[in-house]
């Protein structure tokens, strides 16, 4: 009995371990779980029968053989289970590249097979839609290239005005009114502006027309009777004129009588004047001493008009000449004292593209003080699109005048746009996306490269400055023409990746706004908050 106790203790433990091992294999198998469960139940029933047999007859040989087999299977199952758990702990976690499996797969695995097949059919339809979208993007690119050719003569004229090759006329310099910018076309009304004449007005107009016809000498038979009536009325008016002529002599006689009466009154006035003269004679003796002085004063007064009349004419002429001569003389004296030459009007529009680029959001902070004297030689910025059959892309061309900084007259920056669908990117059809950008090499003159700096050190012994060969990159606008290259294998560093993202944004801004509407960047209107709060659609403005 003492020997049977350890067997009775170990057997149920072995059976329990066997059941755990079978359960773990059933979970790992997936679809074969039902078959494994059935086999496990059969094994459990057999083991249960063997355990019951061994408990009833511990001395029989069959019970010993069954117990030994069950114990051996239990020990093997326990050892295999322990090794599996240890191996799972030792395996490291998968890398990030291995975890690129989309999370939607886990959801699809739970769906029935029939539903999965339908979902795959929808994926194939989406791929066809992406192909249509590539055709749409290519058509947009062709339209941009077509209308860029229409804008080319306008851009050429802008280039000529900026660089003083063409002087605009007065009509071109006039500010266009808002009516000329209106997008609504005015319809021409065919209806007459004037109201139709009334019945009485029609008769008056007909009479006026007939009178005009008479003056021209045309003969109208219908109007002859009316003309005769008018001629008959004319002699009736003549007697009135004669009566008026008869009245005229009567009025003349009355005027003569009035003149005679006035002539009678004149002697009375003369008598009064004589009486006044006698009064003056009575007063005159008191002022006899001053008679000579009065006569001298009279003679002087007579001579004064002649003396004053002659010099007044030149005095007036001098007053007229003073405002014409004095300011010019004063200005000339001031210029002679200061020694400054007369300022001449600048030619063209100086620093046009420098001002434009400084007002661009992402590009302005890149321009350093050392870049400004170089960008003053920038004469034009143009945009060219790729030809048909080539990958979709566009190139910016920066034209420079001859300058002492580099030998290039043309600097280019090319952007290539992704035009093929990517199965790993489910949102390919959301518009343009720049895939790659390429710059150009700048042929700098000696000591004029602003994109790099050289380090200098002062040794402690000699104290002389030694130039080391190590070159340090410097912040500059011209780094825009040397972007980091995208490797075919591997990844970019976070710093280079951020530079490319900002570079793509700058290329999109130049493509959409700067080339087409550079004048608004030059005047600074683009940075006005009024233009940021509203959006322009033709001649109408809508709030965001």
Swiss-Prot record:
InterPro entries: NAP-like_sf (IPR037231), NAP_family (IPR002164). One of its GO terms (cellular component) is cytoplasm. Residues 168-192 have a biased composition (Acidic residues). GO terms for biological process: nucleosome assembly. It is found in: Nucleus; Cytoplasm. Its main location: nucleus. This is Nucleosome assembly protein 1-like 3. It comes from Mus musculus.
């Amino acid at each position: 009995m003492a020997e049977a106790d350890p067997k009775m203790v170990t057997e149920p433990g072995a059976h329990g371990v066997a059941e755990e091992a079978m359960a773990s294999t059933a979970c790992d198998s997936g679809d074969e779980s039902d078959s494994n469960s059935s086999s496990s139940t059969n094994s459990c029933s057999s083991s249960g029968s063997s355990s019951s047999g061994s408990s009833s007859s511990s001395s029989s040989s069959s019970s010993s053989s069954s117990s030994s087999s069950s114990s051996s299977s239990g020990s093997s199952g326990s050892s295999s289970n322990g090794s599996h758990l240890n191996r799972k702990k030792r395996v490291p976690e998968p890398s990030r590249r291995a975890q690129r499996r989309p999370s939607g797969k886990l959801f699809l695995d739970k769906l029935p097979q029939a539903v999965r097949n339908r979902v795959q059919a929808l994926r194939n339809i989406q791929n066809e839609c992406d192909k249509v979208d590539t055709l749409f993007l290519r058509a947009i690119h062709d339209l941009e290239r077509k209308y860029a050719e229409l804008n080319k003569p306008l851009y050429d004229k802008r280039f000529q005005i900026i660089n003083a090759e063409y002087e605009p006329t007065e009509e071109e310099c006039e500010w266009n009114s808002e009516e000329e910018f209106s997008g609504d076309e005015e319809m021409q009304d065919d209806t007459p502006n004037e109201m139709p004449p009334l019945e009485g007005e029609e008769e008056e107009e007909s009479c006026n027309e007939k009178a005009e016809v008479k003056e021209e000498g045309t003969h109208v038979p219908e109007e002859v009777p009316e003309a005769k009536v008018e001629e008959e009325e004319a002699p009736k008016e003549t007697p009135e004129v004669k009566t008026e002529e008869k009245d005229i002599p009567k009025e003349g006689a009355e005027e003569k009588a009035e003149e005679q009466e006035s002539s009678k009154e004149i002697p009375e006035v003369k008598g009064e004047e004589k009486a006044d003269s006698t009064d003056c004679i009575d007063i005159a003796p008191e002022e006899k001493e001053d008679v000579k002085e009065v006569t001298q004063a009279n003679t002087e007064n007579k001579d004064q008009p002649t003396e004053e009349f002659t010099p007044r004419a030149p005095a007036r002429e001098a007053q007229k000449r003073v405002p014409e001569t004095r300011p010019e003389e004063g200005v000339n004296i001031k210029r002679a004292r200061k020694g400054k030459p007369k300022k001449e009007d600048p030619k063209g529009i100086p620093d046009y593209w420098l001002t434009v680029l400084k007002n661009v959001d992402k590009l302005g902070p890149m321009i350093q003080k050392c870049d400004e004297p170089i960008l003053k030689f920038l004469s034009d910025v143009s945009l060219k699109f790729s030809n048909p059959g080539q990958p979709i892309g566009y190139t910016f061309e920066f034209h420079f005048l001859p300058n002492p900084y580099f030998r290039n007259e043309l600097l280019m920056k090319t952007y290539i746009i992704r035009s093929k669908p990517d199965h790993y990117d489910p949102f390919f059809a959301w518009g343009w996306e720049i895939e790659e950008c390429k710059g150009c090499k700048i042929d700098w003159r000696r000591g004029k490269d602003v994109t790099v700096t050289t380090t200098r050190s002062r040794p402690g012994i000699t104290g002389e400055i030694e130039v080391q060969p190590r070159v340090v990159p410097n912040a500059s606008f011209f780094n825009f023409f040397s972007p980091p290259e995208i490797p075919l294998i591997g990844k970019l560093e976070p710093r280079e990746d951020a530079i490319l993202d900002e570079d793509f944004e700058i290329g999109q801004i130049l493509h959409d706004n700067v080339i087409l509407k550079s004048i608004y960047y030059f005047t600074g209107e683009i940075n006005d908050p009024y233009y940021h709060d509203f959006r322009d659609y033709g001649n109408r403005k809508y709030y965001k």
